[in-house]
Amino acid sequence: MSNVIENLGKLDRKVTLAIPKAEVEKEKQDRLVRLSKTVKMSGFRPGKVPMKMVEKQYGQQVEFEVRFDKAARKFFDITKEQDVKVAGQPKFEIKTEGVGEDEVAFDATFEVYPEVKLGDLTGAEVTRTKTEITDAEIDKTIDILRKQRVHYHVRGEAGEHGDGGGDVTAQNGDRVTLDFVGKIEGVEFAGGKAEDFPFVLGEGRMLPEFEAATLGLKVGESKSFPLSFPADYHGKDVAGKTAEFTVTLKKIEWAHLPEVNDAFAKSLGIADGNVDKMRADIRENLEREVKRRTHAMLKDQVMEALLKVSELDVPKALIEQDQERLVEMARRDLEQRGMPNAKDMPIPAEMFAQQAERRVKLGLILAEIVKAHGLEAKADQIKAEIEDFAKSYEDPKEVMRWYYGDQQRLAEMEAYVLENNVVNFVCDKAKVTDKSVSFEELTAEGNAQQA
């Protein structure tokens, strides 16, 4: 039956599309006429090729294109007229049985968007993480910043910061420079020898036995010791083997951390060097990081809750489309990491099947919530979000112009704000339990989730 949409399953549909042959032939001839004005053939000037030759050369291809174009247009008109929401792209197959002599026909199979049944959100359970930034967290951050600006002085040599104390042996925290050579069964191995090799004791850059042997040495002293490489050591040639190392210490430098004063504050971008302003700036940055992490964790909680309380079938076509998007994202990521030939790298779409299904499900659920409850991203919300984002940059006004100067970027921020509104809407309905954690616990939990 032509133009009647058949139900093949929960989401699967089929419609037969009949097109008069006369209509196809007319469109075919029109296209061939247009083509004849530009087509090039040996022995003829452009536009002077006889129509019979044009039709012989291109007629079959043009008719094929016309048939499918007509079928696609008719499919669009029928589904629009019957208010059918098509998910993904239809598949057209030429129909040969039961077709009139004066028509061509196609069977178009496709999927429709599902009905999304939103469950009772009051029964959803969500944990909301809260973290307060204390003075101790600010002090820890300052210590990290000081260590990033560490500079070293030769131990025992007097300077503006002193001589590093009376102990002239290598200690944890010192930067040492040494020569070393390692042998396995009396034979040197690749990577087992170096001269003027620097490293900081206690940072764990070297194997524990190597650092332990270096501790307590004085400049000019040598020491031999056995070192067992772990079985999972990255150097496969020596993994699981024991080597005999000899080290000779050539230089010890002690670490001098900058004092927390106006000069230190200025090095962090505080123009007048005010230490209190520096601490306030650090607090603001940490609070911004807390907001970002806690919001991401809350969003994950809300999304999991929505998946649990909602019922829907997922169109396979949408999953396949999202799989392809994820494949392209993976390729771009590899390309940005400098992977050679990333564009041509074969990445199986199947590896993203579960992720794509989850993303599509959530997209359908969120769209239903937005529609059912009239949620929207208001202009003042979008502006406030952009302003907050811009605060972390040197020139916030330039960041604002950057966003408002590109409709795609603005649309992405609008989608982000709308998603936030959904999260807030769900939290207003659900059972929310607040959980207080330290900044250290927050970062550890966030890093574990990313891993």
Swiss-Prot record:
Keywords: Cell cycle, Cell division, Chaperone, Cytoplasm, Isomerase, Rotamase. It is found in: Cytoplasm. GO terms for biological process: 'de novo' cotranslational protein folding; cell division; chaperone-mediated protein folding; protein transport; protein unfolding. It is an enzyme of class 5 (isomerase). It catalyses: [protein]-peptidylproline (omega=180) = [protein]-peptidylproline (omega=0). The keyword Signal does not apply. One of its GO terms (molecular function) is protein folding chaperone. Residues 173-258 form the PPIase FKBP-type domain. It comes from the Bacteria. The keyword Repeat does not apply. Consists of 3 domains; the N-terminus binds the ribosome, the middle domain has PPIase activity, while the C-terminus has intrinsic chaperone activity on its own. Involved in protein export. Acts as a chaperone by maintaining the newly synthesized protein in an open conformation. Functions as a peptidyl-prolyl cis-trans isomerase. This is Trigger factor. It comes from Cupriavidus pinatubonensis (strain JMP 134 / LMG 1197) (Cupriavidus necator (strain JMP 134)). The lineage of its organism: Bacteria, Pseudomonadati, Pseudomonadota, Betaproteobacteria, Burkholderiales.
